[in-house]
């Protein structure tokens, strides 16, 4: 009898843990989903930029970074 009670308690505990984890997973999924819906334009732009940068050779990437640095310096000079 004591063994059956122990097994029952363990099964109930496992069920409660499973339910609480399922609730946590659902909340996390909704949170990520809401974040994506709010920021999908920026996410797509970031993925496009990452794809373009990933396809560049090292020399093209260095030129790209130099162009960005030059544009930043020109912007700083124009503010002065």
From Swiss-Prot:
GO terms, biological process: defense response to bacterium
Keywords, sorted A to Z: Amidation, Antibiotic, Antimicrobial, Bromination, Secreted, Signal
Compartment(s): Secreted
Signal peptide range in chain numbering: 1-22
Presence of the UniProt keyword Signal in the record: yes
Superkingdom: Eukaryota
Modified residues (6'-bromotryptophan): 24
Propeptide stretch(es), residue numbers: 55-80
Gene Ontology cellular component terms for the protein in this record: extracellular region
Pfam families referenced in this protein's UniProt entry, alphabetically: Styelin
Residues where Leucine amide is found: 53
Main location (coarse class): secreted
InterPro entries assigned: Styelin
The keyword Secreted is assigned to this record: yes
Protein role: Bactericidal against several Gram-positive and Gram-negative bacteria.
Record protein name field: Styelin-C
